[in-house]
Structure formats: C-alpha cells, structure tokens
Amino acid sequence: MDQRPDYHVFRFPSATQTGMIEGRVYLPLEMDETIECIQIIHGMAEHMDRYNSFCRFLVQEGFAVCIHDQAGHGRSTQSPEHLGFFGPVNGADTVLDDIDTAFQEAALRLTDPTDALRIRRFLLGHSMGSFIGRLYCAKSDANVAGAIFSGTSGANPMVGIGILLAGIVIRFKGASYRSKLLETMSSSGNLKRIPDARTPFDWLTRDRAIVDAYNADPACGYRFTAAGYRDLLTWLKRVSSKHWAQQVPVECPVLIVSGDQDPIGQYGEGPAAVAQWLEETGHQVTCRIYSGGRHESLNEINREDVWRDIADWLHRHSDR
C-alpha cells in the first residue's frame, strides 16, 4: 500500500528579507511525462491552510499543487508583529521573487534533474494574490501556461490617494505601524450590501462556518502594516489598465472567477473590466461571475460548482 505523504514541505529565505518562507507541494496521483502544477497565491491576511481541501481536490483531478505562505503571513512570519509586513522597502517587487523561488522548490520535489519529466505551470491567485499573479504574468520570463484570478478587482480611483497616505504614515510612524485609517479606507464599505451581517467578515462568503473559522483564527483578518498597505495598493495600481494586459503573453489563457456580491470586485464590474482589457488585447479569457457569490468563490456555498468549473478549464488547457 502506498504510504507516501500527499505533500512535501519546503522552506527558503524570502527575498523580502523578512525571514523564511514555508510552502508545500502536493504530489500528483501519477507522475506522467508532463506534470501540470497549479501554483496558488493566497490573499491578504490569510494563509495556505485555508486551501487544503481545494488543493486535494486538484490532486484528485490529476494535478500537482504548489502553495506557500507569503511573507508576513501564516508560517512565513517570525512573530505576530511581522503579520502583514513584506519588508520596509521594495516589498511590491521582492514578493514576486518569492513566487519564482517557491515554484523552483516545488519543481525539485516533483522531478529528478536526470529524468525527462516536464512541468507546466498554471497560476491561481486570489484577491491580493490575484493582483500579484496578474503582475507576475506580465513578467517577460514568467513561463505560465495559464492563469486563474479569483476575487480580483478592476481599477480603483482611490489607489493613488491610498499609496500617498501610506507613504505619509510610513514617514511619520514607521513602516511597521498599523494604521486604523488605512484599514478603514480599504474595507469600510465591504458590508454595505449585507444588511444582516453577523461579523465584520461576512462579505467573504455566505458559508457561516468558514466566516466563523476566519474570525477565530489569529492568523486571519489582522490589520496590515502601513508598508503592507503601500505594497498592496502598488500591485493593484500596476495591473489596473489595458497596458498591463498588453504585457501578458497572448498565448496565456485566463479564467476569472468572482461573485456578483463581492465588494472587492465592485460587485462583478471589476472582473468584467479585467476580462475586457484582456479580450481587447487578443487574449483567450473566460469570465465566470456567480450569482449571489461574495468574495471567496473557493469557499462559497456553491464552491463545488466553482471547483468543478476551474478543473474543467484546466483540463481543457492541459497537455495531458
């Protein structure tokens, strides 16, 4: 009987210089000549454990999965004081380097340098992770076979003001300062379409058990540092135009999933705008907006349908 673990843990020094990054690679059921690996980039103020069930679903569909806790998140923090912190400077750039290293670490555990196995990578970024993933796909050396963006956003006219304000806070309070004003600017309207909200995070999903688990988890829902907000808004600014879409290789197909009750996605308008930028620049894009869905499509009450749609899309673009 096969007793192998379903994932291997890897660690490496973060390019942000904030400490060690911890990640996992979930092994595919079979090692074919081509291994297709889904690299997941999680969202703001959460961690990779929240994706365990989805990762195992993808494995059952025949894929390998790579995921890591980003700097300032989950097991990649040295202490609670480091939560929501990508470093005092250049975090918006160095976090992308960690994406590269995480995939390289996963590849080492999926293949032997002497064999002929080939790894094709798909990216899946959620929320903040979708901004990072969108920016990563525009890199000239990204080498991504396809991308999935969940809970993403269109252009936000307040981004420039937010970056300016974060810079002022950093100057006078320090990069690690946690500003209630910055938090309020980023999230104050998230519950406006939920009149019966029980908690500050009901906008995430209609699944109450998942909301309650998120609220009870000290590694979720914390206030970002001022530098963390600056980096978050910088990512969004860099991907909020057709110019970004023009930098994404046209041969990279894209799937966008979102809920029409997601405030981060402007209630469906943001993902639709992102899809339009991609379509106008010649990309093959599929946009799925789920009725009644809130921010976390992967954790919604209709998540089995969402997971199935993602797997079907991956199979359509598979080389296997």
Q: What is the predicted role of each segment?
A:
Residues M1-E30:
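N-terminal cap/lid segment of alpha/beta-hydrolase-fold proteins
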Residues T281-R320:
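Catalytic active-site module of serine/aspartate enzymes centered on a nucleophile-bearing elbow/loop
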Residues T111-S127:
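Alpha/beta-hydrolase fold nucleophile elbow
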Residues G87-R109:
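Alpha/beta-hydrolase active-site loop
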Residues I35, H42-E46, S127-M128, D260-Q261:
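Active-site glycine-rich loops that stabilize anionic/oxyanionic intermediates
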Residues I256-S258:
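Short beta-strand/loop motif that positions the catalytic acidic residue
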